[in-house]
Swiss-Prot record:
Stated family: Belongs to the picornaviridae polyprotein family.
Record protein name field: Genome polyprotein
Sequence ranges of Basic and acidic residues compositional bias: 17-30
Keywords: Capsid protein, Host endosome, Host-virus interaction, Ion channel, Ion transport, T=pseudo3 icosahedral capsid protein, Transport, Viral attachment to host cell, Viral ion channel, Virion, Virus entry into host cell
Signal peptide as annotated in the record: none
Gene Ontology terms: biological process: monoatomic ion transmembrane transport; symbiont entry into host cell; virion attachment to host cell
Cellular-component GO terms for this entry: host cell membrane; host multivesicular body; T=pseudo3 icosahedral viral capsid
Amino acid sequence: ETMLDRIASGDLESSVDDPRSAEDKRFESHIEQGKPYKELRMEVGKQTLKYAQEEL
C-alpha cells in the first residue's frame, strides 16, 4: 500500500492539507470583517509619516 493510498483512505493525513477547521475559518473571516478601514488607515498613516518627515 502506497502513501497516496493511505492518504486517500483517510488513514494518513497529508502534511499540506489546511489544518484549520471550518470554525477557524469562520472566526478568521469575522476578524477580517472587523477591520473594514484597514487600507484607509494605512494610507492615512503613510501621509502622516510623510508630513512629519517633511517638517524635520
